[in-house]
Amino acid sequence: MNIHEHQAKAVLAEFGAPVPRGYPAFTVEEAVAAAEKLGGPVFVVKSQIHAGGRGKGKFKGLGPDAKGGVRVVKSVEDVKTNAAEMLGRVLVTHQTGPKGKQVNRLYVEEGAAIAKEFYLSLLVDRETSMVSVVASTEGGMDIEDVAHATPEKIHSFSIDPATGVWPTHARALAKALGLTGGLAKEAATLLGQLYTAFLAKDMAMLEINPLIVTEDDHLKVLDAKLSFDGNALYRHPDIRALRDESEEDPKEIEASKYDLAYIALDGEIGCMVNGAGLAMATMDIIKLYGAEPANFLDVGGGASKEKVTAAFKIITADPAVKGILVNIFGGIMRCDIIAEGVIAAVKEVGLQVPLVVRLEGTNVELGKKIIRESGLNVIAANDLSDGAEKIVKAVKGAA
């Protein structure tokens, strides 16, 4: 789960991280009130969307010379003018795609005198089962661009959760960023604060870009992005309360209500599969036959008829879907339950696109019999390759 920048900074501030003062604003009036509280002399008006590249982004409906989604201004009146221009508009960045995202809230923050910019992040390293710390002197840029152009400027080290942060880690961070004296001590303190927050809140990623050195020689978190492990949210009602559903795909929100693992993609063939590995294999073979998957959807090992029906309805709600492939290997999951769910869903929502069903495993013959006797126009497949080939042919033939 992702949260907005202003929320991320509030979370980090709880652990003592140095963040600039600022206030969220949902209206122009709230933006003005925030600026008046801050007092100036410099304000930063930031669009709050779940995407990077806001500063270089462009608002739809404004000219090519218009300012982006992060604006530095020097008066309360300028805050008012820019807030009025930004709120309610769609901001397009390199991460949003051409559709962009509507700006429904702003963050009005005090300006900072910047001497240097750094990059700092904490990530879960699944290979080593440790927390990976990534640091670079090239802050304020996309880390992917830095990795491509100057990989030698990216430094990383791992922290073992069994032992936590040691002085050696602090020295490694200071060396990576070229910090000495008081700034090196501040970096050591900050690393401890960030690591504690990372573990305490079950984060999947903590990214600060940029982490700055101010002109009076102090570290400050100028921008922050936090992502949380969705499977651990039950332990953090405070974090769960920060969820902004307007930033998420409605289909993914609906899927979460049924504990379905659903991720929307850009293809034309909807997939309903049980098991993450089989789901990925299904997506791969669809691509092998020349089409693109419209989603990743894992119904899990113990899905009920109602859960399968919900999954089918979520897939068909995507207007980009031109065909559906159901691929089930019944171990814990029974094929007859899948068949009943598919039939119930088709009868409820109707079937406007080709549907191929491949069943194998527990009660497979009963499942096939249920589908065969349903009277619905469902194409049966013998195996995964056969199913992928049939759905791709059906979709391309209907095009």
From Swiss-Prot:
Q: How does it assemble?
A: Heterotetramer of two alpha and two beta subunits.
EC assignment: the record states: 6.2.1.5
Q: Which UniProt keywords apply?
A: ATP-binding, Ligase, Magnesium, Metal-binding, Nucleotide-binding, Tricarboxylic acid cycle
Name the residues that bind Mg(2+).
N209, D223
Q: Where does ATP bind?
A: K46, G53, R54, G55, E109, A112, E117
- Reaction(s) the record says it catalyses: succinate + ATP + CoA = succinyl-CoA + ADP + phosphate; GTP + succinate + CoA = succinyl-CoA + GDP + phosphate
Q: Which GO terms describe its molecular function?
A: ATP binding; magnesium ion binding; succinate-CoA ligase (ADP-forming) activity; succinate-CoA ligase (GDP-forming) activity
Q: What domain of life does the UniProt record list for this protein's source?
A: Bacteria
Query: Where in this chain does the record put each ATP-grasp domain?
Result: 9-254
Q: Which InterPro entries match?
A: ATP-grasp, ATP-grasp_succ-CoA_synth-type, ATP_grasp_subdomain_1, Succ-CoA_synthase_bsu_CS, SUCC_ACL_C, Succ_CoA_ligase-like_bsu, Succinyl-CoA_synth-like
Family, as annotated: Belongs to the succinate/malate CoA ligase beta subunit family.
- Annotated protein name in UniProt: Succinate--CoA ligase [ADP-forming] subunit beta
This protein's GO cellular component annotations are: cytosol; succinate-CoA ligase complex
Which pathway is recorded for this entry? Carbohydrate metabolism; tricarboxylic acid cycle; succinate from succinyl-CoA (ligase route): step 1/1
PANTHER family, per this entry?
A: SUCCINATE--COA LIGASE [GDP-FORMING] SUBUNIT BETA, MITOCHONDRIAL, SUCCINYL-COA SYNTHETASE BETA CHAIN
Matching entries from Pfam families are given as: ATP-grasp_2, Ligase_CoA
Q: Which cofactors are reported in the record for this sequence?
A: Mg(2+)
Gene Ontology biological process terms, A to Z: succinyl-CoA metabolic process; tricarboxylic acid cycle
PROSITE patterns according to UniProt = ATP_GRASP, SUCCINYL_COA_LIG_3
> Which top EC class is given?
ligase
- Name of encoding gene: sucC
Q: How cofactor binds (record note)?
A: Binds 1 Mg(2+) ion per subunit.
Q: What does this protein do?
A: Succinyl-CoA synthetase functions in the citric acid cycle (TCA), coupling the hydrolysis of succinyl-CoA to the synthesis of either ATP or GTP and thus represents the only step of substrate-level phosphorylation in the TCA. The beta subunit provides nucleotide specificity of the enzyme and binds the substrate succinate, while the binding sites for coenzyme A and phosphate are found in the alpha subunit.
